[in-house]
C-alpha cells in the first residue's frame, strides 16, 4: 500500500513545474507523472503522483480501486511552517479546504479525460485566486528558505491576505447568525 504522511510533502519549488502547478511522485515514477501532466488530450496519472498548485493544498493519486468516486485521488489540506509540513485534513469526497471549499466538488468537472486535474480548459470553475497570487505563494513557500519573490508578488500576497480575511470574517459571521 502507498504510505502518505507529512514527510511526503516538501518545498513546492523542489517539485517539477508543469505550466502553473507542480508535480512529484512519492513512488519515484516521476516520468510517468510528467507524461500524464503533459498529455495534450488528458491521461490517467500513475499511483504516487502528487499535484500542488499552492503549498497548502495537494492531491495524491492512490492505488487503483482505493477511492473509485474520486478517481483514486486523495485530497490534502496542509499546514506549512519553516521546514515543517503538517496534515490538517485528508480524505476523498469529504475534504474541505480552509476556506470551506470542497476539494472534490471543485475537481469533479475535470473527470474525463483529465483525471480530475483542473486547468483553465478542463471544466472546473475558476478559483478566486489569480495566477499572480498562486505564483507568489509558490515562490514564498516557507519550507524553501528565502522567498524568491518577483515584481508584484508582495502586492499579490497582500491582496490574497485581504481575500482570506474577508472569507474568514464572512464564515465567522455566518456561524454567529
What are these regions (language model features)?
Residues 1-47:
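N-terminal secretory signal peptides
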Residues 42-177:
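Sequence context surrounding c-type heme c attachment/ligation sites in exported
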Amino acid at each position: 500500500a502507498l504510505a502518505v504522511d507529512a514527510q511526503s510533502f516538501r518545498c513546492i519549488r523542489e517539485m517539477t513545474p508543469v505550466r502553473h502547478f507542480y508535480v512529484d511522485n512519492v513512488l519515484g515514477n516521476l516520468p510517468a507523472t510528467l507524461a500524464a501532466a503533459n498529455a495534450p488530450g488528458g491521461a490517467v496519472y500513475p499511483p504516487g503522483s502528487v499535484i500542488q498548485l499552492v503549498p497548502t493544498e495537494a492531491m495524491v493519486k492512490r492505488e487503483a480501486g482505493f477511492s473509485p468516486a474520486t478517481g483514486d485521488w486523495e485530497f490534502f489540506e496542509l499546514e506549512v511552517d519553516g521546514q515543517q509540513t503538517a496534515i490538517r485534513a485528508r480524505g476523498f469526497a469529504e475534504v474541505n479546504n480552509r476556506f470551506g471549499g470542497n476539494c472534490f466538488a471543485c475537481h469533479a468537472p475535470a473527470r474525463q479525460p483529465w483525471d480530475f486535474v483542473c486547468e483553465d480548459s478542463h471544466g472546473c470553475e475558476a478559483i478566486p485566486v489569480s495566477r499572480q497570487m498562486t505564483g507568489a505563494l509558490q515562490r514564498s513557500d516557507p519550507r524553501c528558505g528565502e522567498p524568491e519573490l518577483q515584481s508584484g508578488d508582495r502586492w499579490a500576497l497582500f491582496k490574497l491576505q485581504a481575500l482570506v480575511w474577508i472569507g474568514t470574517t464572512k464564515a465567522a459571521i455566518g456561524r454567529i447568525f
